[in-house]
Structure formats: C-alpha cells, structure tokens
Amino acid sequence: MSLSKEFKEEIITKFGGTDKNTGKAEVQVALFSNRISDLTGHLQKHPKDKHSRRGLLMLVSKRKKALKYLQNVAIDRYRQVIADLDLRK
C-alpha cells in the first residue's frame, strides 16, 4: 500500500523542515521506515509473497545505507532520527 500524499508531506515536513526538502537523509529514512512497516504487515498476512519480501529486503538495505551515511556525516542528527523513529533499543 502506498502512502497518501498528505501523510507523505507530513513526514517530509516533520523531518525535512519544508515540504520540498525530500533529499535529506532523515526524510529518506523516515519514508523508508514507513514503507517497511507497511510491507511487514502485508507479509504477515501473505507469508508466501516472495516478491514483496524481496522489496522489503531492498528497502531495509536502503534505510541501512542512509543511516550509515547519516551516522558518518552528522552523529547528532543520526541520534535524533533513531530516537524519533524508535529504530534502536
């Protein structure tokens, strides 16, 4: 299921500052995280859907790379994103 336009703009504004700032790593991670949670719910209902599982693994990999970049560039922004999205315990 794709994100609604309003919800996507809300995430972009929250993590990027403006609704046009979609390139920030924080925005990318937040959007990936939302899509990952949607796909996780889908896969719990449809465990044999291998194509969606591959898509989920690709999204997790993209999020991991974006978080690694953010950690190397700005550790304070990385910690803030982790806290806001509850990604690490």
Swiss-Prot record:
It holds the Pfam family Ribosomal_S15. SMART domains: Ribosomal_S15 (SM01387). SUPFAM superfamilies: S15/NS1 RNA-binding domain. Keywords: Ribonucleoprotein, Ribosomal protein, RNA-binding, rRNA-binding. One of its GO terms (biological process) is translation. InterPro entries: Ribosomal_uS15, Ribosomal_uS15_bac-type, uS15_NS1_RNA-bd_sf. One of its GO terms (cellular component) is cytosolic small ribosomal subunit. GO terms for molecular function: rRNA binding; structural constituent of ribosome. One of the primary rRNA binding proteins, it binds directly to 16S rRNA where it helps nucleate assembly of the platform of the 30S subunit by binding and bridging several RNA helices of the 16S rRNA. PANTHER family: RIBOSOMAL PROTEIN S15, BACTERIAL AND ORGANELLAR (PTHR23321), SMALL RIBOSOMAL SUBUNIT PROTEIN US15M (PTHR23321:SF26). HAMAP family: Ribosomal_uS15_B. Part of the 30S ribosomal subunit. Forms a bridge to the 50S subunit in the 70S ribosome, contacting the 23S rRNA. Belongs to the universal ribosomal protein uS15 family. This is Small ribosomal subunit protein uS15. It comes from Chlorobium phaeovibrioides (strain DSM 265 / 1930) (Prosthecochloris vibrioformis (strain DSM 265)).
